[in-house]
Amino acid sequence: MPPMTKAEGKQDKKAQQYGVTPQSVDFNDWYNEVVKKADLADNSPVAGAMVVKPYGTALWENIQRWLDDRFKATGHESLIFPTLIPMNFITKEADHVEGFAPELFTVDRIGTEQLTEPYVLRPTSETIIGYMWSGWLNSYRDLPFLHYQWGSVFRAELRTKAFLRTSEFYWHEGHTAHASEEEARREVRQILDLYHEFCRDILALPVVRGEKTASERFAGAVATYSIEGMMRDGKALQSGTSHYLGQNFSKAFDVKFQTREQREEYAYTTSWAISSRIIGAIIMTHGDDFGLIMPPRIAPIQVVVIPVSRKENFDQMVAEGEKLAHELRAQGLRVKVDRREGVTNGFKYNDWELKGVPVRIELGPRDLEQGVVVVKNRNAEEKETLPREEAIRGMANRLDSIHNWLLQRATDFLLTHTVPADSYEELKNAIEHGNWVRAFHCGNAECEAQIKEDTKATTRNIPLDDAEFFNEREEGVCVKCGQPSAYGKRVIFGRQY
């Protein structure tokens, strides 16, 4: 991973007191410990599957709520499809079955009775949705279909990592059908831009919007677009995808309609998704050596109030803490009062730091007498003593400032650790030092595969012309073979999760 800054390095010794391995010592251990000790998730007795605990579930529910509201606001409708999909559906689209075959969970018996037609646990739902659409669609008047569902999907993973790679994971999957290619492609971009907005404005995650190379496309897609985020170890995380499927699935499942001109035509379809992997992105983009730092706009708890007192007046201080919390909740904030007894204040401070709650307020008897509170931002070293009313009045702005700080820090890291390369040696050296690389590429799949074999890096995407980062158009020759660039701009290479 890229070297830590001097300021971050100074935290290592102090961080050990919290029981979290510093990122600079072992990023993988740091991640696993934070997931467990921050009470986000735990291992389960089912190989490759996790249990998402209440704190992690609350985070996922906030993610669902924001996205669900936006989907509905843009005319999309939710529905529910079966988890079991007939195996013969998967085999109908050749590229689709080839892409998913190694990952399928198969159900071939009920009790001791062998099934004549096996099922699979859904890896994604394009096939069964296409089958149902074929019975629902008759005329252009029925279009567009703007559908999505929330649920879990199943893809066998040998090397699992909580939230990032599990054999069962959680997501929404959107599926739409349109009367024209233009309309379908517009849908693909609308969703990609919505994902970008969500990451930037809600999660404080800077992401690169771009199109995947042919080798990295979704199985059966004509074009795949992604948002790519850089984690604190320099690896990429594909944080969301939007696919233009053309007529591939509609032809496989006979999804056709009568046009205005009374012709029969196959529908143009799309699919798109953000999964629970986005929680991994939050952890690995914003976390530090003391644990999580929750983006304030999505945090399950935005402010924690800690009554500070001796045992004899603890109940009184808890009551005062609840009054303070009530005033903050009146602003629409998510607030918790730590009512735990028999636990030291120091333990509580460390615990909420680990959980990444954006703002901590300490309230003791002397503070109460003086009409002040002690406030500490999760991203700050020092505490502030403020008049009670001032702290309450300024809380929304304080949370916004933390969001902006997180976004700027992550953006600076992305820009610092993304470098151009004009020779193969430069590319290999930059990748080895934990960077993303911007380089020209010929578009040849064999050339791309050789780069992956040599460096363990893949093409992340080809940034769009209106992408926030790295969108410059320029010509050059492939960094590997010297042939002319296929894309008129540099492609992003990086190791990935």
From Swiss-Prot:
GO terms for cellular component: aminoacyl-tRNA synthetase multienzyme complex; cytoplasm. It is found in: Cytoplasm. Transmembrane segments: none annotated. Keywords: Aminoacyl-tRNA synthetase, ATP-binding, Cytoplasm, Ligase, Nucleotide-binding, Protein biosynthesis. Signal peptide: none annotated. One of its GO terms (biological process) is prolyl-tRNA aminoacylation. GO terms for molecular function: ATP binding; proline-tRNA ligase activity. It catalyses: tRNA(Pro) + L-proline + ATP = L-prolyl-tRNA(Pro) + AMP + diphosphate. InterPro entries: aa-tRNA-synt_IIb, aa-tRNA-synth_II, aa-tRNA-synth_II/BPL/LPL, Anticodon-bd, Anticodon-bd_dom_sf, Pro-tRNA-ligase_IIa, Pro-tRNA-ligase_IIa_arc-type, Pro-tRNA_ligase_II_C. Catalyzes the attachment of proline to tRNA(Pro) in a two-step reaction: proline is first activated by ATP to form Pro-AMP and then transferred to the acceptor end of tRNA(Pro). Consists of three domains: the N-terminal catalytic domain, the anticodon-binding domain and the C-terminal extension. Homodimer. This is Proline--tRNA ligase. The lineage of its organism: Bacteria, Thermotogati, Deinococcota, Deinococci, Deinococcales. The gene is proS.
